[in-house]
Amino acid sequence: MLISQSWLTRILQTSNPQWSVSAEEFDAGFVRVGFETEGYEAIPETTGPLVIGRVEKIEELTEFKKPIRYCDVNVGQANGTGELQHIICGARNFAEGDNVVIALPGTVLPGPFEISARKTYGKISEGMICSAMEVGLASQQNPGIMTISDADLASANLKVGDDARELLGLQDTIFDVNITPDRGYALSARGLARELASSFDLQFRDPAQDPAAAAMRNDLFAGLPGTDGEVQALKVDEDTKCSKFGMRKVTGIDPQAESPLWLQRELMLCGQRPVNPATDVTNYVMFLLGQPMHAFDADKVTGELHVRLAKKGEKLTTLDDVERTLDPEDVVISDESGIQSLAGVMGGSTSEISEATTNVLFEAAHWDQITVARTCRRHKLSSEASRRFERGTDAAIIEDALDFAVALLVNIAGGQVEEGRTLVGAVPEMPMITIHTSLPGKTAGKIYPDGTTISRLREVGCEVRETGSRDDNGAREIEVTPPTWRPDLTMPADLVEEVLRLEGLEDIPSIVPTAPAGRGYTPRQRMRRNVGQALAWAGYAEILPTPFIANDVFDVWDLPADDPRRLTVKVQNPLESDYACIGTTLLPSMIESLRRNVTRGQRDAALYGVEQVSVPKSAKPFSPMPSVKQRPGAEELQELLDSLPAQPLHVAVVATGNRQLQGTWGEPEAFTAADAIESARVVARAAGVEITVRNAEYLPWHPGRCAEILVGDKVVGHAGELHPQVCERAELPPRTVAMEMNLDALPLEETFPRPVLSAFPAVLQDIAVVVDEATPAQDVEDALRAGAGELLEEIRLFDVYHSESLGEGKRSLTFSLRFRAPDRTLTEEEASKSREAALQFATEKVGAQLRA
């Protein structure tokens, strides 16, 4: 929030007349009570003759592409001669007789921009008529020149030719205070002044009830008519969650009136552009008290105002001239002619204040925080009002805000306040929180003086009552009721934070506890680490799969309707509506990542990811969220636990293109289904388990090039080549391969005894066998392994050969066999006997014949 140091200082000086600090101390004061400032900046200095002038004559120059005015301006004796200054200006919002700010030759405006007499548009221009931005009061260009009323000059005891700096308040500093979402009360001068009073140990008078405390006229509220009776018929529907709604009315204002300079200045320094007195008053009250308001042109409101939920398809053109289609969850204010406002966010254009408005209806309300936040998100629309309603406002000051608004408007634009006030609803009841006074000290590890907790909570604005009870250490029990402007205080921890914040977070001792002895990784963590390292060493690049998958991905895969992978967890408020499901498999995310790599030119890619998936236990919807006001009961907790999905840890691999690139070492080698199966073996070795593979049909894999991975008799994953249609629909090259395994299904303890490491040499032999084309290579390998006996240490398939000479429907499989004895040097004869035994057993089991 942007706010000037002078505004906050004036509020605090009403109770502390002599108080004043530097900008650096001001900044430190914010930090001391837990508020960060994005920065602070003094209004840029203007040097030289910056004076008040009066426009005496305007000559319109029409021979140029845009309208130009040649003005005669009276600057008194400021120019040393008393003669009129002749100044060229392109702005159109001032007239003869208006008081303006003049930068005479020799003035250096912020920029720096030096003013000198020079010829332009065929005339000599002897200075500049300034806008608010040009003198440093506004950060954005305001439409036109800044004019000063005679009343502003009289109140400051100034005349034409006098220096304008003091009137403009150019000796000031602007602070940009970072307000966290839980502290909506601080989005106001009232809230920040209260915090600074605590920081500097000052007295504080609440400006909500006392105009003098807001550094305004003591008699501002004097003469306000009574509030008996209604000024506007009103109906508030209960389902809108509007707890309080109030209105007051002003009639007969001067439609040509302008806001005084002091009001325009405060708004500009808060980053708000002055518009007209009625709108400026609502913005000023919002920045002063933190209560957003809206001003209706009362003559454009017909019949009863109705606070209700929008109907589907209703439309509203908001003040930013955008037509919006409303949602049934949006809260609106309507009358007999239609919708007039999007509640808590922005008013409608049909009843906005115009240059002809003479009767104004002010509205102030207390809207539901969540409803306003969802409306803003839904319409991608944010405003100063919605920022405050989203964070929570003070329902207790609605009447005060209305009184401020009507009194200020009458003071500025004339007219009279209509007797009566429409008020529906009441201030929501604040929760009572019970704590012991020792809790802040226990939390901080610091002993605070007796009474600190009570005094600090009262300083925040809480009502504190001692119950008379004490804990075992003698600490008093107190019942605390937070103030209405602090809806964020709901539990003991919130009260502890307030005490520690005001006592000084920097005073809490920084004592590092003794770290317990490390126990290392758990077996599951060790498995995950080993698997990741093994795949990385095998040449795969790690990615972090997103848990969200496209709603239609399983339709793209043509999965059967009864496939259990279709039963997914649905997210109620997804980041993207097309990705509202939490995956039961990692492959959709892996395939999408591979697609992005391929489309960006990475044709040869091998990726792996290790992440949890979510597998619902049933199609039953989740239990509703429990209340946060109390701990859930045992039955409610069990129901919640039963409804949570299982979240097994999966590992997945996808690869496409060439496994080995072309080079001096040889021709390129493409990824095949065998590489996907080998990645499963890499995972198994890293996890310390033994797997087997066999043919399978399992989408999204190719039905003839898919293997299921087993540990014992349990299927733990699949690997192979993706289905051609899946590749085409996913925009992947043909013959892309993939593997996915359930790591949680792998046993933590090895299912086979660790082999004894032998120091004796191994004997390597190869064997080539001819088998039927339909015989799985795994079956042949298993038969050879079983027949070779205990001397066989490793068997590996390294060649598959097809030829007409082998016979129709035949193929050759060549295996490398490694034999080793644990207690002696193995001879070639012994190894050959084991090889012959392996061949004989394979012949009996799978019909394998030794290849000639």
From Swiss-Prot:
Mg(2+) binds at residues 488, 494, 497-498. Binds 2 magnesium ions per tetramer. SUPFAM superfamilies: Anticodon-binding domain of PheRS, Class II aaRS and biotin synthetases, Nucleic acid-binding proteins, PheT/TilS domain, Putative DNA-binding domain. It is found in: Cytoplasm. Keywords: Aminoacyl-tRNA synthetase, ATP-binding, Cytoplasm, Ligase, Magnesium, Metal-binding, Nucleotide-binding, Protein biosynthesis, RNA-binding, tRNA-binding. Its cofactor is Mg(2+). Disulfide bonds: none annotated. Residues 428-510 form the B5 domain. Its EC number is 6.1.1.20. Residues 44-159 form the tRNA-binding domain. Gene3D superfamilies: 3.30.56.10, Bira Bifunctional Protein, Domain 2, Ferrodoxin-fold anticodon-binding domain, Nucleic acid-binding proteins, Phenylalanyl-trna Synthetase, Chain B, domain 3. It comes from the Bacteria. One of its GO terms (molecular function) is tRNA binding. Pfam families: B3_4, B5, FDX-ACB, tRNA_bind, tRNA_synthFbeta. It catalyses: tRNA(Phe) + L-phenylalanine + ATP = L-phenylalanyl-tRNA(Phe) + AMP + diphosphate + H(+). One of its GO terms (biological process) is phenylalanyl-tRNA aminoacylation. InterPro entries: aa-tRNA-synth_II/BPL/LPL, B3/B4_tRNA-bd, DNA-bd_dom_put_sf, Fdx_antiC-bd, Fdx_antiC-bd_sf, NA-bd_OB-fold, Phe-tRNA-ligase_IIc_bsu, Phe-tRNA-ligase_IIc_bsu_bact. Residues 758-851 form the FDX-ACB domain. Tetramer of two alpha and two beta subunits. Belongs to the phenylalanyl-tRNA synthetase beta subunit family. Type 1 subfamily. This is Phenylalanine--tRNA ligase beta subunit. It comes from Corynebacterium jeikeium (strain K411).
